[in-house]
C-alpha cells in the first residue's frame, strides 16, 4: 500500500486530530461523524483506527509500519513504547517537532530535497534514525534558510518536547535524549495498536 496523498481533512474528520498531517481543523459544527458513524464500536474497528492514526500522522506506508512493529517486538521493553520512540526519532519527525516544517510531509520534503544536515552531513533519507547528541541544521545557503524561516517564525516554543532543544537564530536543533512517552505529539493508545 502506498503513501496517502488524498484529502487530509477527510482523514482528520474520521480519526481525530493529527498534528503531523495538517494544521487545518474541520468545522466544529459538522455532525457528519454522528450521522454516518454512530452505533457500537467493535473491537476490530477501534484497533484499526489506532493503527490508521499512527500511520497517517507519521506518513508511513503499511510495509514501513510493519517493519517498525517487527523491530519494536524484538526489544525487551514494552513494544508499544519502543514503537513510539522509533517513530519519534525519525529525521522527518524531528525536523517537524523542531518547528523547521509545519507538517511531517513538509519536513519529509525538506529532507528529500537535501536542505537538512545531521552532524554536518547532508542526509536525504526521511526515515534516518536520529540518536542522542545529533545536531540538526539547515544548509548554509539562503534558499534553505528561507524555506525554514517561515515555519520557525510561526512555531510556538511551548510545544517543543523536552528531549529536543532549538536555536531559532542559527536554524539549529539538538536531540538531547530518547523521547519519554508523555511528550509524544499524538493522542494514541499504543497497546490497542500492538494488539491489532
UniProtKB/Swiss-Prot annotation:
**Which one of the record's GO molecular function terms can you name?**
rRNA binding
Q: Answer yes or no on keyword Transport.
A: no
Does the record's keyword annotation contain Protein biosynthesis? no
Q: Where in the cell is it found?
A: Plastid, Chloroplast
* Residue ranges annotated for the S4 RNA-binding domain, each copy included: 89-150
Gene Ontology cellular component? chloroplast; small ribosomal subunit
**Which SUPFAM superfamilies does this one have?**
Alpha-L RNA-binding motif
User: What main location does UniProt list?
Assistant: plastid
Its GO biological process annotations read:
ribosomal small subunit biogenesis; translation
TM annotation in the entry: none
Q: Which Gene3D superfamilies match?
A: Ribosomal Protein S4 Delta 41, Chain A, domain 1, RNA-binding S4 domain
Q: Note the superkingdom of the native organism.
A: Eukaryota
For this UniProt record, give its keywords in alphabetical order, as a comma-separated list: Chloroplast, Plastid, Ribonucleoprotein, Ribosomal protein, RNA-binding, rRNA-binding
Note the subunit structure. Part of the 30S ribosomal subunit. Contacts protein S5. The interaction surface between S4 and S5 is involved in control of translational fidelity.
Q: What is the similarity comment for this entry?
A: Belongs to the universal ribosomal protein uS4 family.
Q: What does this protein do?
A: One of the primary rRNA binding proteins, it binds directly to 16S rRNA where it nucleates assembly of the body of the 30S subunit.
Name of the protein this chain belongs to: Small ribosomal subunit protein uS4c
Q: Which organism is it from?
A: Eleusine indica (Goosegrass)
